[in-house]
Design a protein with these regions (language model features):
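Metal-associated gating/positioning segment near the N- to mid-region
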Residues: 1-34
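Short, surface-exposed connector motifs at secondary-structure boundaries
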Residues: 13-21, 82-87, 144-150, 168-172
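Metal-coordinating catalytic core of metallo-dependent amide/deamination hydrolases
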Residues: 32-157, 162
């Protein structure tokens, strides 16, 4: 019920602002949001929130397989309904294992849809990858081979010159 009400409020706000489309980074109970958005007339893309790192609250903890399966179910039920598309999502890159990143990217390619992630939002995210991988976030994803025209990097605030070149070269 809360998700339905939230989606109704969000759709009304988007319409009131004069926009005709949106991309929702994802949450839980997205089936309820999809029903609202499909009936709103808006063009949009939505995702299931996927994270699989240890230490997440029990209410949202899942493994990579379950995370991808949840998006598969959302895709099968709502992709193409009205003006909706379903994208695969890496909710917070630092909360996603390499396995989840690779599985979500593979599935997005199979389904010919987008893979989206919040990227380079704050210095701590960049430091996290520099300390663990000696790579910046986009460099890390590039090393995994998941970047391309099918990838949507939201925010992308703190980019290095090398990351900008990667984005250009991979047509992100």
């Amino acid at each position: 019920e809360k998700m339905r009400l939230s989606a109704q409020a969000a759709a009304a706000e988007v319409i009131h602002a004069g926009s005709t489309g949106f991309i929702d980074a994802g949450s839980y109970f997205m089936e309820e949001a999809a029903k609202v958005y499909a009936g709103s007339g808006l063009r949009g893309a939505l995702s299931y929130s996927t994270m699989d790192q240890a230490g997440l609250p029990e209410s949202i903890a899942m493994d990579a397989g379950t995370a991808v399966q949840k998006t598969d179910e959302l895709y099968e039920g709502f992709h193409g309904l009205g003006n909706l598309k379903v994208y695969y999502s890496l909710r917070s890159l630092i909360s996603c294992s390499e396995e989840l990143i690779l599985r979500a990217a593979e599935r997005a390619k199979e389904k010919q849809t987008m893979l989206q992630a919040h990227m380079n939002e704050y210095p701590g995210e960049i430091n996290f990858y520099m300390e663990r991988k000696q790579l910046r976030p986009y460099e890390y994803l590039d090393s995994l081979g998941v970047l391309g025209e099918h990838f949507l990097g939201a925010h992308s605030l703190h980019l290095s010159e090398q990351e900008i070149e990667i984005l250009k070269d991979r047509k992100v």
